[in-house]
Amino acid sequence: LVYFQPKSGLNPEHQELFKKNRLITVRQLKYSKHNENSIDMGIFINGIPIMMMELKNTLTGQDHNDGIRQWKFDRDPKEPLFKFKRNLVYFSVGNEKVSMTTRLIGSKTRFLPFNKDIENPVNKRGHKTHYLWDDILQPNFVLDLIENYVHIRTETEKVYDPQREKVLDKKSDVLIFPRYHQLNVIRRL
């Protein structure tokens, strides 16, 4: 489904397969049979959804917090495109800040910052969130992210079941997508 960058140039066939990967964006992506709602941008690799984005602009009076509200309250997590592990990450992107989550669960969805620092530095050539477009969303880096950083961890929690009158292990999966500062540290090492 996806061919990652070869570790060496010794296998020309693998090189050719890697070059055939297609990272595409879809603007105003309609996702439901029940309404006409759309997501500002969907990113796919070889037709597989990997990232969804709500894009907000201060010139229209909106910021990344408006995108977060949209994900929490206007996007039904039961829609097939939003089911857990269907996408790797959901971004809310403004001119000044970026937030992300890996699981939509309605109003309880937890977003984390995906910024360079507490405040993104001023960019004399454009938006403060340029790093998302200029660095992170480059095709080779997206593939590197998927291959080396994104993973699923199974967590086990002890819960008491009153019907059975005993403590049980409750397992749940957590999709790990690194935040910007984590990626930045690894890249600098």
Question: Where are the model-predicted features located?
Answer:
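ATP-dependent helicase/translocase motor core
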Residues: 1-189
